[in-house]
Amino acid sequence: MEFIQKKTNDSAVERFLSKAAESGISLVWDRYEGQLPECGFCESGLSCRDCLQGPCVSHPFRDSNKLGVCGKDKDILASQTLLRLVIKGTVASLDQLSDFTKGVESNKIKLKNKAKTDQLLKESRNLLQNGGVAITKEFPKSMVQRWEESGIIPEGIAGDIFKASQKLEGGIAGFEENLLWAFKVSLLAGMAQKLQGSLKKAVFGNTSPAKMEVNLGILKKETPNLLLYGSLSPVLKQMIAEAAEKKKVHVAGVCTDPHLPPYHFSPVTNYVSQEIPLMSGAVDLIVAGDQFVNPSLSHLAKYYQTPIISVGVLNGERDLNKLAKDIVEQAKKSFDFRRKIPRDIPEVTESAVMGFSCEDLDLKKVVKDLSKGKIKGIAILSGSNNVKFTQDRELVTIAQEFLKNDILCISEGEASISLAKYGFLNPSKNDMELGKGLSDLLRSLGKALPSILDLGSSENGGVTDFLLNLAKADKKEPRDYPLLACFAEANRSTEVAEALWMVAMGISTYFWPSLPVSGSPKTMEALSHLCQEQFGSKLHVLTDKKMEPRIKADLMIKDLTGERGPRLSGHPWK
């Protein structure tokens, strides 16, 4: 990968890059360039450290197939590299669900719907222990039947995570079996996210679309700023919000779910620029989870005298209510202590309406416009940021091309934050260049809808609910519609697991940067043709590092409309 000439598209972030250089502060872009050139074996999935006889490598040249000490060939290495990523990503989703259920079971919060909460707690325990037999009833029978025939129906942590991890330890499983194990594990992640979203509604109430401000300009100059970083228990977040409201402490978020009725945590920035808020001098305290939080924060926080509280420490406070009150009190003390530190807050904000759900949208109108050809298809925009790309550029450019070509765009998680910064989630700016069919559809769905519809944090399974309800609207399967998922600037293993979940549901998925499987032509081929046979969809892994985002968008649009072959639905749309 070459040096990134332009680091970010975000003007609020860009103004701090020269400040960092002048101060000798190393940011994520500097550290990335310090790692170049990247290891080609690791990048293509052909390295292994699974035992102490290595590390071993293979190579992708012609028909040659260098074996590891234990006999792993390049196909096994690449497929196991993908499996390893999916296991990591799935464990992250299961950990979130486990933390949430423990918080709810502590009986420290008032439940909106106790009967529904009790039912979902039971289903969550069942998923964690026995697999997703109960929750599969919510999916189309034909989809579940394909999962059963492929052998990927979840059987719980012991049945899936433990056994899948042993595929990395040894055995004679071939690369196709490794890939099916990766899909089996990814189903656990998708179902955990769906359950977490349902449980959150039962505990806190339904999330309705909320207007909020995004970007660095939301930081306060004369008020303590407490920032929540990464995935945190919704129970703890609610307690922090309640305590902060009483003490007049401003709470905002970075890489965290912004919706928690009745509270909202306005996003300050997104993943790749998570260090930048500290450079404003206006962050008085950070509460950090583990997922989506970079270790570099701790070094930069010392420079700006900002305390960080990690909620994942081994001997941490178990009483969440007490912990929340202590956090807010420490934020106030830190604000007083840091008064002499200059606050350089850029006046850059953008309004956004976020948090739509299926209840807010008439999906029958969407299906009707699809059938009449008024819109060409639906694109699911996912993923976060990756330092290998100019921040936000790939996603924003692809979104622009989709909108111009009458493709309905829905977004989730960090992708929504990226898009919100540039006005795509602002209803007052829905006069952006839209195709006529899409413009008419959005007007028919409701007053003052933004150009792109955010379905909330990926940890809540909003996209899954959308797909299932879309299928019910016309008694079809998701794969019967012209649909695609796009991870334009993917980063974390959770996104890899989610991409496989999308494919297992029948949604052809495009993933950038290239997954570490390119060293094995057989694995690359299987992600296309094996997935098409098993699920009616493909995982597109493109290896051209210099492909411009408009070219990527054009490729996806042609696949969606059938210009490069059969439409993504697998047959002509009727």
Locate each region found by the language model.
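Anaerobic metallocofactor- and corrinoid-dependent redox/one-carbon enzyme cores
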Residues: 2-574
